[in-house]
Design a protein with these regions (language model features):
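Short active-site oxyanion
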Residues: 62-64, 137-141
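Cofactor-binding loop segments of dinucleotide-utilizing enzymes, especially the Rossmann-like FAD-
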Residues: 6-8, 93-95, 120, 145, ...
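Active-site flanking residues adjacent to catalytic metal/cofactor-binding acidic residues
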Residues: 69, 93-95, 143, 181-185
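Catalytic metal-binding/acid-base residues of hydrolase active sites
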Residues: 72, 96-98, 146, 186-188, ...
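Active-site glycine-rich loop that binds ribose-phosphate moieties when present
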Residues: 109-135, 143-150, 159-168
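Short hydrophobic beta-strand segments
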Residues: 1-6, 87-90, 142
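Active-site histidine-anchored catalytic micro-motif
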Residues: 63-131, 220
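Catalytic cores of soluble, metal-dependent hydrolases
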Residues: 2-65, 76-77, 83, 151-258
Length: 258
C-alpha cells in the first residue's frame, strides 16, 4: 500500500492535524499551492492533484491509502480510480449522511455535502473539473449515518443508495466491484474519540468500527481508502486513542497486502 497524507479540511491546509502515522510506514505528505479565486477552484485544484496521485498509485499496482482531514477528498480519489480504469463502488462509513445541498444546508458547511457532490449534485462546482463520472446510486452503501437532517432522509427515501448499520455490515451487504472505502472516524461515539469537529452521540465503539472495517478488507475488493481524521487541529492525543485507531487500521491493511 502507498500512504498519501493530505492534511486538509476542504481547502484549508492543516499542518497541525496531528495524525499519529506509524513510523514504519512510508508516507508521502501532500501540500499543494491553491491560488484559485474561490473555494470551488481551490477544491478542484486540490482534488485534481489527489486524483493524479491515486491514478499513479493504482497504475503502479499499489493500494492508495489517503489519510486526510475530511471526506470530500474522496471525490478526488474516485476520479483517480476512474482515470486508472476502475469503476468503484462506494462504502461510506460516517456518523452523518454528507448528503446536504447548497439549497438545503442549514449551516453552509461543504463537508456536509461530500457524498451528494460525489453522486452528481452540481457537477459544475467540482466534478466537471475532474472529469468525474458519478457512481450509480445502487452501488453506494451508506453505513451508520445516525445523524441525518430531514432533507438528507428525504433524499435517501427516494434514491438508490443502500444503508446499513455498522454492526449489520456483512460481506453480503457490500456493493459489487472494486470498493472505495470512505471511513470518517467521527462515526465513533464521542466518548471514544474526543475532539471531533462534529460529534454525534450514541455511536459505536472502537471494536465495532474495526470489525466493520475488516469486513471490507476481507472482501479482497478494496481499491482505495480515505481515512478521514475529522478532529480539530492542534489537539494532542494524550490517551493514545488516535494512534491506536490509525495504527490498527493500517496494520490490518498491510496484513491483507502480504
Amino acid at each position: 500500500m502507498s500512504v498519501l497524507y493530505v492534511p486538509y479540511h476542504l481547502d484549508e491546509h492543516q499542518p497541525d492535524l496531528n495524525v499519529p502515522l506509524p513510523g514504519d510506514v512510508p508516507v508521502a505528505e501532500f501540500a499543494v499551492e491553491l491560488p484559485g479565486p474561490d473555494v470551488w477552484s481551490r477544491l478542484g485544484q486540490l482534488y485534481d492533484a489527489v486524483a493524479a496521485a491515486v491514478e499513479r498509485t493504482v497504475r503502479a499496482g499499489t493500494l492508495p491509502v489517503v489519510v486526510s482531514g475530511d471526506c470530500t477528498v474522496s471525490i478526488g480519489m474516485t476520479a483517480g480510480l476512474q482515470r486508472a480504469g476502475l469503476d468503484p463502488s462506494i462504502v461510506w462509513i460516517d456518523a452523518h449522511g454528507d448528503l446536504q445541498t447548497l439549497e438545503t444546508t442549514p449551516s453552509g458547511y461543504l463537508g456536509g455535502m461530500a457524498l451528494r457532490f460525489l453522486l452528481g449534485y452540481r457537477p459544475d462546482h467540482v466534478a466537471d473539473r475532474l472529469a468525474l463520472r458519478p457512481p450509480a446510486e445502487e452501488r453506494v452503501l451508506l453505513v451508520d449515518a445516525r445523524d441525518l437532517d430531514p432533507p438528507e432522509a428525504d433524499y435517501l427515501a427516494s434514491s438508490g443508495v443502500s444503508r446499513s448499520g455498522l454492526d449489520a455490515l456483512t460481506p453480503e451487504t457490500l456493493p459489487p466491484g472494486p470498493i472505495l472505502l470512505n471511513l470518517d472516524l467521527d462515526v465513533l461515539d464521542p466518548s471514544c474519540l474526543p475532539g471531533l469537529r462534529y460529534p454525534a452521540a450514541d455511536g459505536p465503539g472502537v471494536a465495532a468500527l474495526l470489525r466493520a472495517t475488516r469486513v471490507v478488507l476481507d472482501s479482497g475488493r478494496l481499491a482505495a481508502l480515505n481515512l478521514a481524521c475529522t478532529w480539530h487541529p492542534g489537539r494532542t492525543d494524550p490517551d493514545g486513542i488516535r494512534e491506536h485507531l490509525v495504527t490498527t487500521i493500517l496494520a490490518d491493511l498491510r496484513a491483507k497486502q502480504v
